[in-house]
Amino acid sequence: MITRWLLITSFLALAILSLSSAAKKSEPEITPSSFDNEPFSLFYFEDTETILMNTRDGNLFRSFDGGKGWEQVDDPNGKMKKGVRSIWQHPFDKNRAYALGANRRHWVTKDQAKTWESFEVDGYAATQHEPLIFHGWDSSKVIFQSDECMGRFCIVKSYYSTDDFKTVSPLRVSAGGCAWAVGHPQFAEGLNLEDELRDRVLCIVPGLKVPSAHANRLVYSDDFFRSDAEGTELNIQQGRPVSGILSAAAVKKFFVTAAKSQGTNELALYVTLDTKAWHRADFGGHRVEQDGYTLLESTNYSMQVDVLTSPSSNTGILFTSNSNGTYFTRNVEHTNRDRFGHVDFEKIADIQGIVLVNTVKNWDKVGSENEKKVVSSISFDDGRTFQSLKVGDKQLHLHSVTTFANTGRVFSSPAPGLVMGVGNTGDHLKKYSEGSLYVSDDAGVTWRHALDGPFKYEFGDQGSVIMAVSDKGTTDEIQFSIDHGKEWHSTKLQHKIYPKLLTTTPDSTSLTFLLVGSEESSGTKHVVYSIDFRGLHERKCEKDDFEKWAARLNENGEPDCLMGHQQFFNRRKANADCFVDEEFKDPQPIFEPCKCSFEDFECDFNFVRSEDGKSCVPAAPLVPPVGRCQKQTDTFMGPSGWRLIPGNTCTREGGENLDKDVERPCKDVVSAPSHDKLMAQKQVFNDARQFSEQYYYLERQASSSGDDETVIMLTSEGEFWVSHDHGKNWEQPLKGVKIAAIVPHPYYSDGAFLLTRDKQAFWTVDRAYTFKSFEAPIPPNQEGLPVLSFHPQYKDWLIWTGAVDCAHGDCHSDAYFSKNRGENWDLLLRYVGKCEFESRENRPGSEKLIFCQQYENENKKNHLQLLSSENLFSDSHVHFNDAIRYATMSEYIIVASRDPDNPDSLVASVSVDGRTFARAEFPPNVDVPVKTAFTVLDSSTHAVFLHVTVSDVKGAEHGSIIKSNSNGTSYVLSLNAASRNEWGYVDFEKMQGLEGVAVVNIISNVEAVLKKGPTAKKLKTMITHNDGGQWMLLPPPAKDADGKNFGCSVKGGKGSGQCSLHLHGYTERRDPRDTFSSGSAIGLMMGIGNVGAHLSGKDEADTFMTRDGGITWKSVKKGRYMWEYGDSGSVIVIVPELRPTKVLYYSLDEGDNWEPYEFSEVEMHIYRLSTVPSDTSKNFLLWGKEVESNRLATINVDFSGLRKKSCNLVENGQESDDYYLWEPKHPFQEDNCLFGHVEQYHRKKPSSQCWNNWREPHVHSIGRNCTCTRADYECNYNYEPQNDGSCALVPGLPKPDALAVCREDPDRVEYWEPTAYRRIPQTTCAGGLILDHVVSKPCPSKEKEYEKKHGISGTGLFFAIMIPIVAAAGVGYYVYAKWDGKFGQIRLGENAGTYEGLLSRESPIVTVPIAVIAGIVAVIRALPLLAMSLWRSASGYVRLGRNRAYSRPYASRGSFAARRGDYTSVVDDEDELLGVDDAEIDEDDEL
């Protein structure tokens, strides 16, 4: 019995052992699945083994068992098969995912792919923006974004759903997409703003008038733009809106937006915690440039940002913010980046404070011949200090984000403390293919070699299993370790594959891995392996199998503190023969508190770190307790400047208490006193004989940091001077070097080039703080051509046009190209005229487009041809064989060429796309058989004003001003007898900042001056308030500056033939910068002239000004004065012109009162009065010469001390204590309607004792639209204005061919019988008086369509009529303004049947008329072309001398570059169209 029992017992024991042995496997279970198409994207649903996979053919597959079995997903109607373009996982809801279709049908699952529901959106999923934007609090709220494109142009249309796409509603059309304010669950956490932020949406929308990136605005709505289609603009900086918004993104508890102004690459980053209070991020004086920053993985209490410092070497600086994202501290320099902005930076998962970073060791030597030497380092204290990675005593370097070969995190996973990477030991990082696999199980403190060669790797079962697969070509085996990478085992695969992806569940708690690869044999078969390690251990880990592991250790090997606590994990011991086997249960950290220390505190709001980083100093004056600080020597108890970092859990007892109040000196609270007087500072130039005309302001743009006001200038002796404080102090950085010319960078206001008379030249890109020299290939040209041409987008791209063979009788010019600011040069063309880059925003693919004039067959006796090329003239296209001159302005290229039918006459041809040109046709009632000269004046109101010379007889030069329709193809007469000078320049000037206001001088005695004899011109000044539709004389003021009556008077506020105000215009100015108006001082104009029957001589002139855009005028001073505006018009300075003085006058109330100020102890002749081009400074600079000593001097006059505070602007309200709403108006209209709408501007009240302190372009809004009146129309083609204001057909001319539109557009259904009128291009009026469309008729053979069309509803009829009209007109820029005003803003939800689509104001058709090629006349302010030019071209004669030829000094601010001088710089030779085309941002002046 006992024996039998022993036998049975032994048998059972053997059986149990056998079963145990069978259960414990040595290899994982591998299950392959084959697919005909490559897996495109896949992801796990969190806390499940459910996988969703999209293949490249558009099919969708799912697996519920970790990839062992797959099934194709389809909907009942079969639409999902081959219909899924991309899949998206909801980042905040583990149950939801989205499958976006290739068409307009999409799908959503709310149960982890078990079931799917379809939904439709009227648009394709966006490709340039995120197609889905998720709400951080409510997973049922999603924004869907689509790209609607025409050709290469796309706009972003956003839709929203609040119920998981059961319903979808249009949100709005935008320029940069929309986002939920709550973009992350942590946003506004604990702020009790749930009701306020629940539905808030932020969108990047275009400027009110300008569809360019630098005008984009950030607006929000709390009701999906239902109640207000425009939305509310966010006050981002100092309580005011910011333009130039490029991007906006949620980063955990932060919301960040970036803005960039025109004329700079510097970005301003703004951060908010609630979308209400915004702060500009301060990087300690470091610039953040466009495409030069990367938001990195951030913590709950700070942001990490890497800022590009060297584009050539792709290196940066890593910054870490304080808890509110306002102040950033520099952590690591020379971080390694790639050209896409990826940075070698990663935090170790789930462990606070450990960061791996790669830096460039030889950052200062990286170039074309020197490769980067990348080294790796690690921080255990949140980036405060870094140390090397070590394998024993050797340094280890690992490949990081920029060379990552898998998906997910690079080094770590939620497996506590386990870190892996591919790299090498030695001096620096080698190629990825030369690397090996290394592992650390103490969070990077120590490392060991794991496997030879590069591998893809993953962690499973909280680190109990590590799997790797070779990443060096093909393989048929995998490697795995179950002891933290100390020992490795291999297992064969069924196929030999190219591994593409190795992954597992996101929390790394599963024992199943997924390997995706392509078979080596076929290359078209794709395999997905499910690799299950469950059988390798037979038991589950118990308590004794775990250890308490400290996540961070200090330099002494002790647990370290961060954010007030130490962090520990219970993790499986490396040698434990068990699996944790707790799927989807993340390792939980254990926190133990620490005593508060220095590291637990940060600078409080309005405090910044001191230079040594050991204290916090006030960033703004402190407010002392009431009754304290009566004297500066007093003290008071105030804030220390420190605060405990929010979220920090340190124990205060026994620790540091840095945030307790401290005794502070009262000097910390006393701001710079308002001394109630001006400050003048004179600088004398003893060795200089004269100032040259070359002086330039390198003005900071709105997004630029810093506060210097830099001026650079030349003396007549070629001495170069720089001032960084607006002329208070000057220095000579290139003393001893004779500079011949200063060439400011027209697209980059921080840069300038200095040229000598030989090949030596200099550049600065940091606002003249430093200069670097370069050698040009040849000396500057001697033909009056621009020496340098600049690329609008790439600031380092240059074209140099220099002189060749001038000492040997064949003097000509050659053009060279440089991509690196003159370091290297390549020959473009020989025997050239002007060469320019023609890249523009509205010309996609034009980055390399260059235009050049070249003498045919490289012989100067031949004609100048106009060529273009997109490959540096490896090949080229000839556009014109006899191009006299060409110029570019805004989106247009205009060419003056010889008329083939009349060689003595000029013709103009225009292109928008830079590839196809068409001739511009002039109106028949301007009968000039031989067009010897014409001048293109302006196009800022989306129509071209052109002056056609009628007479070029010396002393009788004049012509007719004609105005184009919106696409430049049809011109009508606007005004006759406009005066010009012998050089072709016209007394015509647009008022900056206001639509449609222009001033011109006409000759009242044309017939007399045309007769032989000494009769002089009698000029009268006229003004238009509706863009040339109507002109009137300037109304004279009632009294002069002394309160006396003038010799004549008028009634009713109108000027008369015998009594009106006349102003000296552009052609009489000593300095072309002295324009009447300013782009920032809205409504203000100043000028010198007289009241009477006509304009008298300058010696009889007085000084006048207007505050209402030219409606009324007042005399401010007897005599001639120069003027300048400051602080956007809140201060005006005038100084006598060319007579000895030591006194200037200033007004702080828009000219109501004038105060004298003695700026010099001795009398001076003042030649020039200047300030920054935007007129936003409170500093002014006088340039002159002392009368007695004859010494040159500059005097800075500083007004900043006169007032203490900044004005308070309530942008979204109506008015405030400091501002009122001002509406421009027409003098003979009662409703303030101009161009079909009422514009409103915030203007400072003259009585307000404050400063504007704002550098942004002037903010304005469209208050309302108006019904149409006669003022919204102008005379049609072949019609001319009559004395009673009506339009009549020119005698002998036919009516316009109405049927032409039908012939040109075969799909057109109807046409309109021509009338005498057409709409002014920029009007936005709706309804009311209809003068241009009275009778419609069907196009031939379109009778049925016509009948069908006119049977539709009123709204549909409106669209059916207007859309063809808009298309026929060429879809120019005016449509942008027209449709914007008519509908206010896109109301996508109002009527799905009349959805504006591509005809909305943001539409590329409307804003970018790239398809319009024919007949658009150039947007050039001054383009004089004289008959002499033809003769010179034929004879080969070129005049080299210069008279008043100089570059325009105000080449600094993008949005204000055109406000000073409606003519760009020109050389004195009249055969030059434009000398410096720096005003090509003309259309962008006003946002």
UniProtKB/Swiss-Prot annotation:
Q: Which residues form a coiled coil?
A: none
Listed under GO cellular component are: cytosol; Golgi apparatus; membrane
Q: Which InterPro entries match?
A: Sialidase_sf, Sortilin_C, Sortilin_N, VPS10, VPS10-sortilin, WD40/YVTN_repeat-like_dom_sf
**Alphabetized SMART domains for the sequence:** VPS10
From the UniProt record, give one GO term of the biological process aspect.
Golgi to endosome transport
The protein's topology relative to the membrane is:
Multi-pass membrane protein
Q: Name the glycosylated positions.
A: N300, N324, N967, N1265
- The lineage's top-level taxon is Eukaryota
The record's BNR repeats, renumbered to this chain, cover 61-71, 378-387, 438-448, 479-489, 721-731, 816-826, 1104-1114, 1145-1155
> Membrane-crossing residues?
1357-1377, 1405-1425
**Signal sequence segment:** 1-22
Q: Which residues lie on this side of the membrane: Lumenal?
A: 23-1356, 1426-1487
Q: SUPFAM superfamilies in the record, alphabetically?
A: Oligoxyloglucan reducing end-specific cellobiohydrolase (SSF110296), Sialidases (SSF50939)
* UniProt keyword terms in alphabetical order: Glycoprotein, Golgi apparatus, Membrane, Protein transport, Receptor, Repeat, Signal, Transmembrane, Transmembrane helix, Transport
Can you say where in the cell this protein is located? Golgi apparatus, trans-Golgi network membrane; Prevacuolar compartment membrane
Cytoplasmic topological intervals? 1378-1404
Chief subcellular location equals Golgi
The record's function comment reads: Functions as a sorting receptor in the Golgi compartment required for the intracellular sorting and delivery of soluble vacuolar proteins, like carboxypeptidase Y (CPY) and proteinase A. Executes multiple rounds of sorting by cycling between the late Golgi and a prevacuolar endosome-like compartment.
- Similarity remark: Belongs to the VPS10-related sortilin family.
What protein am I looking at?
Answer: Vacuolar protein sorting/targeting protein 10
